[in-house]
């Protein structure tokens, strides 16, 4: 963790707090919010990590988001969630947030830095897609573009995710690691078994705005995912008209498209680099929201 914080300091990343949550913030000096509003600069990015070791396990993804020479740079927000990250010394370790608090806290962070004026892009992985779904349902106009990687937020009424993550006999080294170092870790086990509101956490296809618009939404599925039934999720999304935004990666494992350097991670970041013109109803909605908040 100290190594990660040293890297953050080198990239001029600040650690701040809002309500119960610490978060990392990077604001590039050459980024201009007016350009983002006009679609001439990338939108700020909110990164929502999954279960495991928190920010350190996503070092490659976060480093890519912070920008490299010759690539567009944007503000990056990364909430640190102790109940999902082995942070057993945190006073919040056994007190995970639920949908209302999650949406309200993240909206407060976004407004604190003025990013509600242009809206944000959100990239989430695994359990992070559930927090992503809270935002989509409660702060619809604020979330301008979405990348959902290994999304466990779909089809939570089927048994695969629960069974594979908590009960299935481990048949591989990857599954063994997930079982003993993730699923049975105290904070994560407490979150999953005592504070997991299935009905609030599920995201229905009709609740995902622009679900089949490749300029607004991207969904990445790993064909050999050990947590969710990726082929089943792909078929479910296709039945609901969500085809053009889905990238299915045969043979890839859970986290493989975002935790290590690969062409799919490059694809995600390149997609986020694109400016997004805000016209018509979208900008009117954002202006209306800002006026009401004021």
Predicted features and spans:
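Short, small-residue-biased leader/transition segments that mark boundaries at the very start
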Residues: 2-4
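Short alpha-helix in the alpha/beta-hydrolase fold that links the catalytic acid
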Residues: 61, 229-239
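Short beta-strand/loop motif that positions the catalytic acidic residue
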Residues: 213, 219-221
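Conserved acidic catalytic loop of the alpha/beta-hydrolase fold
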Residues: 100-119
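Short, surface-exposed "cap/lid" segments of acyl-processing enzymes
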Residues: 16-73, 80-82
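Active-site nucleophile loop of the alpha/beta-hydrolase fold
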Residues: 81, 147-157
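Catalytic active-site module of serine/aspartate enzymes centered on a nucleophile-bearing elbow/loop
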Residues: 244-294
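Gly/Ala-rich beta-loop-alpha elbow adjacent to hydrolase catalytic centers
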Residues: 123-132
């Amino acid at each position: 963790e100290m190594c990660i914080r040293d890297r953050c300091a080198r990239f001029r990343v600040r650690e701040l707090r809002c309500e119960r949550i610490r978060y990392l913030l990077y604001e590039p000096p050459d980024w201009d919010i007016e350009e983002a509003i006009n679609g001439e600069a990338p939108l700020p990015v909110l990164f929502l990590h999954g279960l495991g070791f928190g920010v350190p396990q996503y070092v490659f993804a976060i480093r890519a988001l912070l920008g490299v020479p010759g690539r567009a740079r944007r503000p990056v927000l990364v909430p640190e969630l102790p109940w999902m990250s082995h942070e057993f010394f945190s006073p919040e370790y056994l007190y995970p947030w639920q949908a209302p608090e999650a949406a309200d806290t993240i909206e407060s962070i976004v407004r604190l830095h003025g990013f509600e004026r242009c809206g944000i892009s959100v990239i989430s992985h695994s359990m992070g897609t559930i927090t992503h779904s809270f935002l989509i349902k409660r702060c619809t106009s604020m979330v301008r573009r979405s990348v959902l990687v290994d999304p466990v937020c779909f089809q939570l009424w089927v048994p695969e995710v629960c069974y594979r993550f908590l009960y299935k006999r481990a048949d591989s080294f990857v599954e063994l690691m997930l079982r003993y170092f993730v699923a049975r870790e105290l904070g994560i086990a407490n979150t999953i078994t005592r504070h997991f509101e299935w009905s609030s956490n599920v995201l229905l296809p009709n609740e995902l705005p622009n679900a089949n618009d490749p300029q607004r939404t991207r969904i990445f599925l790993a064909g050999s995912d050990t947590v969710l039934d990726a082929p089943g999720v792909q078929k479910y999304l296709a039945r609901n008209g969500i085809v053009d935004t889905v990238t299915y990666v045969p043979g890839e494992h859970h986290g493989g498209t975002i935790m290590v350097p690969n062409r799919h991670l490059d694809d995600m970041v390149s997609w986020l680099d694109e400016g997004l013109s805000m016209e018509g109803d979208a900008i009117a909605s954002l202006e209306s929201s800002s006026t009401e908040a004021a």
